[in-house]
């Protein structure tokens, strides 16, 4: 938290004195932080040494501002309620794989139009996925999310890709191939910070889109995308759409950190 806030990558609610905020003058108290110099994995080591139950010591991080940080764009009561349900379902299905962090995020189902060079992006995607450009659908969301460029925080567009077979169904992809796809696009298109690949869709427009995020990391300063079985992602997506009737599509975020941040904000 301290490293990323001082570096301008994130604004953490719990980082104060390290960025020049005098809590004694402003609030009348001094913050005592015996673990402030430790990274997350080191805090876990301390917890294990103190014999704190693993249900506490090993649980995944949760942002101080709560689910609002995973609510991209405007925060509304119904939107948060949908995200709570999607989060519960995501954690239920993915906990057995023990990713370092795994959660759901929610985006308003609104496109940024017109968007330049959509055909060019579709062509790159088709080449990497070994299909015709006609089998690729591109969506750029109106809301944006945080990323990292040159060790600094940036806001960038969220790119979503769907590929379909001859029967019109979504093509299953190995995660490693989707990682190759995001590298091919994001290394040249610095206006994007997150690349999403569609897992499932309802077929009719609804207000929201859910993004499943799962990463592997030791220090949370960098992170790799979790290589999860496609069947589990599908099961998660189908249950989300069954329980969340206002969700139109479900995607998997296949962007490592960097260029994305782990959270959407």
Model segments located where?
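ATP/NTP-dependent adenylation/nucleotidyl-transfer catalytic domains that generate, transfer
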Residues: 1-265
């Amino acid at each position: 938290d301290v490293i990323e806030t001082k570096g301008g990558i994130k604004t953490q609610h719990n980082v104060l004195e390290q960025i020049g905020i005098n809590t004694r003058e402003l609030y009348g108290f001094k913050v005592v932080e015996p673990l402030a110099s430790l990274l997350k994995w080191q805090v876990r080591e301390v917890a294990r040494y103190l014999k704190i139950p693993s249900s506490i010591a090993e649980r995944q991080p949760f942002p101080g501002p709560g689910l609002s940080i995973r609510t991209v764009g405007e925060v509304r009561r119904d939107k948060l309620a949908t995200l709570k349900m999607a989060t519960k379902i995501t954690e239920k299905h993915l906990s057995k794989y023990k990713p370092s962090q795994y959660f759901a995020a929610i985006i308003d189902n609104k496109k940024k139009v017109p968007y330049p060079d959509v055909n060019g992006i579709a062509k790159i995607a088709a080449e990497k996925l070994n299909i015709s450009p006609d089998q690729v659908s591109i969506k750029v969301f109106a809301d944006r999310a945080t990323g990292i460029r040159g060790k600094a925080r940036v806001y960038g567009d969220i790119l979503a890709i769907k590929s379909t077979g001859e029967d019109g169904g979504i093509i299953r992809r190995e995660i490693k191939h989707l990682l190759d796809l995001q590298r091919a696009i994001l290394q040249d298109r610095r206006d994007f910070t997150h690349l999403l690949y569609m897992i499932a869709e309802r077929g009719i427009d609804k207000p929201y889109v859910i993004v499943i995020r799962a990463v592997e990391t030791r220090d949370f300063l960098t992170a790799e995308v979790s290589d999860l079985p496609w069947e589990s992602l599908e099961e998660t997506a189908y249950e989300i759409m069954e329980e969340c009737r206002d969700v139109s599509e479900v995607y998997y975020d296949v962007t490592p950190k960097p260029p994305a941040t782990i959270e959407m904000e």
